[in-house]
Amino acid sequence: MGTPNRWLSSYLDNRTQQCFVNGSLSNTYTLLCGVSQGTILGPLLFLLYLNDLPSCLSSSEPRMCADDIHLTCAGNEIYSIQSSLNRDLLNISHWLTANKLTLDMTKTEFMSIGTRQKLNNLPSPTAIEINVTGINQVYSTKSLSIIIDGNLTWVNHIDILSKKNCCWYWSYQTNHTLCTSGNSTWYIYRGIVQSHFDYCNVVWDNCGKNSFA
């Protein structure tokens, strides 16, 4: 245990918080769990806090980014996939309870991915749930600023990119006289427009020409 343990203990133990609302200050409350926010060590400690969550999964493949968790489960039979996901979601619920964390059901959703023909043949509704509480089904979702749809066509993502860059184009047309040189225009383009096209393009640049129509 030694010095590192004492150092972390002094950092985490006996932390208190108060709320100030409408000119009134609450009593001091001692924090018994969790990681302090607004600190340099906070994000690292939070990752360590969540680090063993995948150990409770039996079938799904987790992808974790801070407090966002994506589960992927693949298979040929929809009922087998449902059973595997529901079992792992129940395991996650137990893990969160044991670690004094709460799942935000308003941000919890699921999406089926496959060919258009296979998705059309899926039973409706698909029953994915946590503790008998149904999870909302979506047909496109945002993951790390990438819009993903069930057919992986990337049409929705490209549509968002087009709208953003159209806004930039009209803004530039209105204010282009403020750019005193061609280099200024180039730097603005690289920073505002091309950065959108470059972001994660290894994921979505396999889309067909029709996606840009």
Cite the ranges covered by each PLM segment.
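Charged boundary/loop elements
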Residues: C200-F212
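Short, conserved phosphate/pyrophosphate- and ester-handling motifs at nucleotide-, phospho-/glycolipid
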Residues: G38, G42
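Catalytic palm subdomain of template-directed nucleic-acid polymerases
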Residues: S58, I69-T97, N206
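Hydrophobic alpha-helical membrane-association signature
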Residues: L45-Y49, L85-D88, L161, W168
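Active-site palm subdomain of RNA-directed nucleic acid polymerases
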Residues: L25, P43-T72, T180
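Conserved pre-catalytic core of RNA-dependent polymerases
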Residues: M1-V35
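Short, conserved micro-motifs composed of acidic
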Residues: G23-L25, R87, T102-S140
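Basic, alpha-helical interaction scaffolds
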Residues: S58, V132-V203
